[in-house]
């Protein structure tokens, strides 16, 4: 029986740009079904270090929904919501940008407890410039 891998990534995806799209496509190549957590407003938990999104959550949802590589979008408000989502969704791999390698990520303990692989996708924008 072949293994079916559900993947997960998350972010605010404000002003969706080619780097976001490339990252999401790369994540989808590495799993069978990709769930994207959409952070509604990062300033709820971290007003001192994050900016309020320019686009509405509805606009960002529609843009993500237009990507063929996104299978499911789950909006969330807080980091606690993210942890709860990761504790309940059937996911086998979480995709994170390589810029987070070596850093503590939200839900890392849930990944350890549930045996969810954390896969770092290289983040480089130089190949996107022509």
Locate predicted features.
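Short hydrophobic/charged patches on amphipathic alpha-helices used for structural packing
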Residues: 61, 82-83, 87
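Proline-aspartate-enriched helix->loop->beta-strand connector
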Residues: 85-86, 90-95
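Conserved small/polar residues in nucleotide/adenosyl-binding loops
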Residues: 126-130
